[in-house]
Amino acid sequence: MIKKILLPVFALALGLVSCERDDDKYVSTCPVIHDMTFKSVVTETDRIVAGEKFVATVEQAQKGHLLYKAEYKWSDALDEGVHKPAFTSVVYDNYSNNPSDTIVFNSPGTYKVKLVAKYHISGNADASVVRTNEIPGGKVQYELPSWMYYRVTVTKNVRVQAAP
């Protein structure tokens, strides 16, 4: 009789202890963003001129892990830029390059460029990812809106100069 009682109790205790801490290798980690950079296609410098193409690149200081899909949406605050993103959706674990967009602003001024990246989780989610970091001229906001994906929003101001 005691064996019948102790066996299920022992099995339950063993199951609870084994679930106490998940192994880190099964945790999906979000990319850590270093900065958003801007580079002219024409001069290959950071001097951005109205009417000329430039590339906005979100640089990752650390790649993500166990992310099966990434979706990228580029925009600007005034919706005045012409955007041509390199990719809008990738299998992140196979293609974890820095997201980039080719943009043209036709008028000089200061514009806020934004990337909203959605990283679909294929392992265990990490709730400690939620935070906001400052970058020069902008910020990076990390969110976990559901246990199925991370959302990373990167915004930065770019100064567009008048054509010479």
Feature locations, PLM:
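Short acidic/polar inter-strand loop motif in beta-rich domains
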Residues: 119-126
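Residue-level recognition of secondary-structure-to-loop junctions
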Residues: 95, 103-107
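Low-complexity "stalk/linker" and mucin-like segments enriched in Ser/Thr/Pro/Ala/Gly
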Residues: 71-96
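Structural beta-strand segments of beta-rich domains
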Residues: 52-56
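Acidic, Ser/Thr
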Residues: 58-63
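Short beta-strand segments of immunoglobulin-like
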Residues: 42-48
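Bacterial Sec-dependent N-terminal signal peptides
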Residues: 2, 13-40
